[in-house]
């Protein structure tokens, strides 16, 4: 591998910035109509449309990534700065069960200071639900000064990233061959980012986080705990907490690794003081991950003729019934960044769902489990992110099909074979959606009807006709019994939610307990299956028919987004790949809503609550999920209305901001319908009347007003929706 760069390829100049639309011949001429500003935004980052040169496109994307990292670091710096300057972090650290986290104080302008509630410890501010305090505690931050230093450090890193983005586009821009060298990239990303990244975090946890958290858990005042660098430079300090530290690296080289089991543990379960995972378990986990990825980062063939070649692996990958197998896929992934991105988004989206579920079932940070608002926010956040990632995967897969797919190279490989039997795939998926839709909804309708007729004995419920999720219960059971059977080394199962164990309470609140699954969960899980399958149907159909269909055989020539196939072809509107993404987004929202409703209600009903001195648990909604959520009426009455009414009645209290957001969000949603339920022609006619009036008064603008195009109107609508 030779690192090939081109020196000074493009001179640095701000002249182009002064010329809006410099990237397109038509846009650079300036505006004739108001459509110009929309096209400017739509195409500014569509590098494919600026040039066909893959090397130039790759350099722009690469450079933009540094800019993205800079923005992320600036944002993070702001979070840490708020923690340093406007928060009650030190107070929270000394009493995390009674004091609520706050890092924002509203200034007294037009009475807004009503939003500053009493969060405890003599601090008035807005309670935050981002989980930052819990992360800071887990990483061993004990003072606001440390947060301040970290914030400054992040800004310095952001500046470095901005410099790197400029440098690698203007001063030393990589050649195309460098972007296409997948083996070298895999080695560096696996060993460097994931391997050394995990190793350095594990090192930080062992040397800084663990001793500090050990002392905090024991009730030592944060101000008396030695500073982080003292633990690193003075081994005796750590050795007082973990005696094996005194032996240094001898046990490591002597292969007596069990000596280190004081701070690299395999306990399972949660720390009873904090309600979070044992940080000694997570340190061990990151060390193990680091080893795996450091090995993985040495598996691919570069300068020395050993290791895997990705092209060889893909081309050897064929079964008896799969034609040419993965032949041609290597060429796709090295010449189409859309294809590459689609795969990565799909996998990252799936991973994000896993993260969402682990945040509550295995709370990774101290005191996260008893901060219910934060738990709910983190779940919601990761679910939304996952939705955008998965829809984005379909969008870029479709763009790949339209712009980058070359049917002459892809013959009888797996991609070609999937495309050739797409009718079978889509019609089967359609059948699955119909089946799931009628059956899942039908179970609810049956229950609503029986409930209305006063026949509870004929309902599907845990107390009448049971539909127990036996497979899910079996999975729960195998995991709950693992410590005594398949995982003899672990002291407890991976999560309290599996069952078997007792509940864990921290500060009089339930941190976690075994989550029972019953008929109500069985019903709502089939709604999940339904909404997810419909989302997949819409998105996959968009990808499989992006280039051609029986209706429009030459769809590839029309591009990724087009409103209709021209005059004289009725019934061809809303058929572009873009429109499938547009429709898929609505079902993604649908799916997420049901997921978040299910999670919110289930946790409040069966998990979250307070515990008395006698050990009696009182759940927030009193365990009403199992009997109430089995009818549509129950969802409307006992969840949506019961919970919304609290928000609606919040005006005039410190919670009023949430009531206003609630109102405002519904307002924005209703506003979206104006774009979605109206025709373009209506607005064009209206605009022309208004322009006529302006002409009469001789105040007509030079730039002609035009209604949004059909696609633009839909984009604005779906964004507000």
From Swiss-Prot:
<dbReference type="GO" id="GO:0009522">
    <property type="term" value="C:photosystem I"/>
</dbReference>
<dbReference type="GO" id="GO:0051539">
    <property type="term" value="F:4 iron, 4 sulfur cluster binding"/>
</dbReference>
<dbReference type="InterPro" id="IPR001280">
    <property type="entry name" value="PSI_PsaA/B"/>
</dbReference>
<feature type="transmembrane region" description="Helical; Name=IV">
    <location>
        <begin position="282"/>
        <end position="300"/>
    </location>
</feature>
<dbReference type="InterPro" id="IPR036408">
    <property type="entry name" value="PSI_PsaA/B_sf"/>
</dbReference>
<feature type="transmembrane region" description="Helical; Name=XI">
    <location>
        <begin position="715"/>
        <end position="721"/>
    </location>
</feature>
<keyword id="KW-0793">Thylakoid</keyword>
<keyword id="KW-0157">Chromophore</keyword>
<feature type="binding site" description="axial binding residue">
    <location>
        <position position="666"/>
    </location>
    <ligand>
        <name>chlorophyll a'</name>
    </ligand>
</feature>
<feature type="transmembrane region" description="Helical; Name=III">
    <location>
        <begin position="186"/>
        <end position="210"/>
    </location>
</feature>
<dbReference type="InterPro" id="IPR020586">
    <property type="entry name" value="PSI_PsaA/B_CS"/>
</dbReference>
<keyword id="KW-0603">Photosystem I</keyword>
<feature type="binding site">
    <location>
        <position position="683"/>
    </location>
    <ligand>
        <name>phylloquinone</name>
    </ligand>
</feature>
<feature type="transmembrane region" description="Helical; Name=VIII">
    <location>
        <begin position="522"/>
        <end position="540"/>
    </location>
</feature>
<keyword id="KW-0812">Transmembrane</keyword>
<dbReference type="GO" id="GO:0015979">
    <property type="term" value="P:photosynthesis"/>
</dbReference>
<feature type="transmembrane region" description="Helical; Name=I">
    <location>
        <begin position="61"/>
        <end position="84"/>
    </location>
</feature>
<comment type="subunit">
    <text>The PsaA/B heterodimer binds the P700 chlorophyll special pair and subsequent electron acceptors. PSI consists of a core antenna complex that captures photons, and an electron transfer chain that converts photonic excitation into a charge separation. The eukaryotic PSI reaction center is composed of at least 11 subunits.</text>
</comment>
<keyword id="KW-0004">4Fe-4S</keyword>
<feature type="transmembrane region" description="Helical; Name=V">
    <location>
        <begin position="337"/>
        <end position="360"/>
    </location>
</feature>
<keyword id="KW-0472">Membrane</keyword>
<keyword id="KW-0479">Metal-binding</keyword>
<comment type="function">
    <text>PsaA and PsaB bind P700, the primary electron donor of photosystem I (PSI), as well as the electron acceptors A0, A1 and FX. PSI is a plastocyanin-ferredoxin oxidoreductase, converting photonic excitation into a charge separation, which transfers an electron from the donor P700 chlorophyll pair to the spectroscopically characterized acceptors A0, A1, FX, FA and FB in turn. Oxidized P700 is reduced on the lumenal side of the thylakoid membrane by plastocyanin.</text>
</comment>
<keyword id="KW-0460">Magnesium</keyword>
<keyword id="KW-0249">Electron transport</keyword>
<keyword id="KW-0602">Photosynthesis</keyword>
<protein>
    <recommendedName>
        <fullName>Photosystem I P700 chlorophyll a apoprotein A1</fullName>
        <ecNumber>1.97.1.12</ecNumber>
    </recommendedName>
</protein>
<keyword id="KW-0411">Iron-sulfur</keyword>
<dbReference type="GO" id="GO:0016168">
    <property type="term" value="F:chlorophyll binding"/>
</dbReference>
<keyword id="KW-1133">Transmembrane helix</keyword>
<feature type="binding site">
    <location>
        <position position="564"/>
    </location>
    <ligand>
        <name>[4Fe-4S] cluster</name>
    </ligand>
</feature>
<dbReference type="GO" id="GO:0016491">
    <property type="term" value="F:oxidoreductase activity"/>
</dbReference>
<dbReference type="GO" id="GO:0046872">
    <property type="term" value="F:metal ion binding"/>
</dbReference>
<keyword id="KW-0148">Chlorophyll</keyword>
<feature type="transmembrane region" description="Helical; Name=X">
    <location>
        <begin position="655"/>
        <end position="677"/>
    </location>
</feature>
<dbReference type="GO" id="GO:0009535">
    <property type="term" value="C:chloroplast thylakoid membrane"/>
</dbReference>
<dbReference type="InterPro" id="IPR006243">
    <property type="entry name" value="PSI_PsaA"/>
</dbReference>
<feature type="transmembrane region" description="Helical; Name=IX">
    <location>
        <begin position="580"/>
        <end position="601"/>
    </location>
</feature>
<keyword id="KW-0813">Transport</keyword>
<dbReference type="Pfam" id="PF00223">
    <property type="entry name" value="PsaA_PsaB"/>
</dbReference>
<feature type="binding site" description="axial binding residue">
    <location>
        <position position="674"/>
    </location>
    <ligand>
        <name>chlorophyll a</name>
    </ligand>
</feature>
<feature type="binding site">
    <location>
        <position position="682"/>
    </location>
    <ligand>
        <name>chlorophyll a</name>
    </ligand>
</feature>
